[in-house]
Amino acid sequence: MGNFIDKTFTVIADILLKVLPASKQEKEAFSYYRAGMSAQSKGRYAEALQNYYEALQVEEDPYDRSYTLYNIGLIYGNTGKYTQALEFYHQALSLNANLPQALNNIAVIYHSQALRAQSLEEDEYIELSKELFDKAAEYWIQALKLAPDNYPGARNWLKVTGRLSDNN
């Protein structure tokens, strides 16, 4: 199914590039972005990153840049480079605050780090885990405000841990 979706996206993207009015620079940026998405969907992360970075060099539109930055964050997150992932998610959000998926992914990283810290069972790590859980909650609440029907697992965790009230 993924291969069909990738091919469909490529065909639609090619048609859009031909029929929509766009500058040469916009078309170039979109071509890099499209190549990055294709490589990313096939797990070729180095190639995807290269294309995304090329897209950022020529893309001027903040909205379009936000999705490129978001996808770079996805790759870093998928490869365990969480500090870089957080950096790119935050950059994406600075250009486009309406990215609940970036907020969710930030929360997932903080939640995962909190669980890891909690498992160490030393006082300093217990406090760190509480801070990280609170950060995860903060980002999940923001994501749920933008996309109330998404992230049911996050909503449940927030309710169970007492971090979600009727005011959130």
Swiss-Prot record:
It is found in: Plastid, Chloroplast thylakoid membrane. Coiled coil: none annotated. The lineage of its organism: Eukaryota, Sar, Stramenopiles, Ochrophyta, Bacillariophyta. This is Photosystem I assembly protein Ycf3. GO terms for cellular component: chloroplast thylakoid membrane. Keywords: Chloroplast, Membrane, Photosynthesis, Plastid, Repeat, Thylakoid, TPR repeat. It comes from Phaeodactylum tricornutum (strain CCAP 1055/1). TPR repeats lie at residues 29-62, 66-99, 117-150. Belongs to the Ycf3 family.
